[in-house]
Design a protein with these regions (language model features):
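Non-catalytic, topology-defining segments of multipass membrane proteins
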Residues: 1-200, 204, 244-302
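Active-site-proximal inter-transmembrane loops
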Residues: 147-154, 208-234, 239-241
């Protein structure tokens, strides 16, 4: 896994597969939701509920620490093995490959709530910002030019291409150990909840909450969303300084993902966790704006 590839030899554009990939994303997404009703026949056991709760929390950490804070923003460092394991864990949540995810998220930050933002509820409507953008054929290809720093690693390109391998492996493992109830209630239910939990940051966190910082978008801080996403709900903080590993800037802004990463750093599993500069915090903070009031963008933070 230590082998690196020259960025000039990145895979060719897969734009020609966009239409097919858009359909291939829509159908499984719908089927997973429908399959959740199979619990009528499999039953709902306490064991399956525990499995589902554990899978939700662990895979939410994979999404927040993996997809978002590491691959999209590189807010901390880890080893080659750690990078692969983070990618695998993130992809067990079935939100496509880490390179695809990171590329589109970087576009979001560059054009947040402006024309060209891939999932803004402000410019594209709530449904598009929440989930509809995933099914847009034009957004199906991986934007390789956005992730040249990550696409050097062949193991990440492999996982990005075969992005269903981690979630399918997990699903089969759950089925083998806990049976059909474990698969439906433990895996499928937690997967649907995980999806929509993550999606709320793209949608609700741009329309519902309080603004602590003047950012050039409509991002909000929302403690409820922070609770269900292990800390991602401090979204206005994040858009104020996206390079910070910790998104709960204040001591009372709980950020479970950061706490876990901090503990991992004690064992040298991750390192170089980043914090917002003190002068940035002092210079930009202002009284919070009331819930659901329109944001007034100011200067762009580069």
């Amino acid at each position: 896994m230590n082998q690196r590839t020259d960025p000039s030899t990145l895979p060719p554009s897969d734009t020609e597969l966009a239409k097919h990939n858009g359909l291939s994303a829509t159908l499984p997404f719908a089927l997973v939701h429908v399959a959740c009703f199979a619990a009528i026949w499999t039953g709902v056991t306490s064991e399956a509920l525990v499995v589902g709760a554990v899978l939700y929390v662990v895979r939410m950490f994979g999404a927040t620490a993996g997809y978002h804070r590491y691959f999209a923003h590189r807010t901390f460092e880890t080893s080659h093995v750690g990078r692969f394991l983070l990618a695998w864990l993130a992809q067990t949540g079935a939100q496509k490959g880490v390179l695809w995810w990171a590329a589109h998220h970087r576009i979001h930050h560059q054009r947040s709530d402006q024309p060209g933002d891939v999932h803004s509820p402000v410019t594209g409507g709530f449904w598009h910002g929440h989930v509809g953008w995933i099914f847009d054929p034009e957004l199906s290809p991986t934007r390789w030019s956005r992730v040249r720093d990550l696409a050097r690693f062949p193991e990440l390109r492999f996982l990005n291409r075969f992005w269903l391998l981690p979630p399918l492996s997990l699903a089969l493992t759950v089925l083998a150990i806990w049976g059909w109830s474990g698969l439906v209630v433990g895996f499928l239910w937690s997967t649907v909840l995980l999806w929509h939990g993550v999606f709320t940051i793209n949608s609700l966190a741009h329309v519902w909450g309080r603004r602590t910082f003047d950012t050039p978008d409509h991002s909000r801080n929302n403690p409820l969303l922070a609770l269900i996403t292990l800390g991602e709900g401090w979204h206005n903080n994040h858009h104020h300084y996206m390079l910070s590993t910790r998104q709960g800037f204040r001591w009372w802004q709980f950020d479970i993902t950061y706490y876990v990463l901090k503990v991992m750093s004690w064992f040298h599993l991750v390192w170089d966790l980043r914090a917002p500069p003190a002068e940035l915090m002092r210079a930009q903070v202002r009284p919070a704006v009331a819930v659901l009031t329109p944001a007034q963008p100011s200067a762009v933070l580069r």
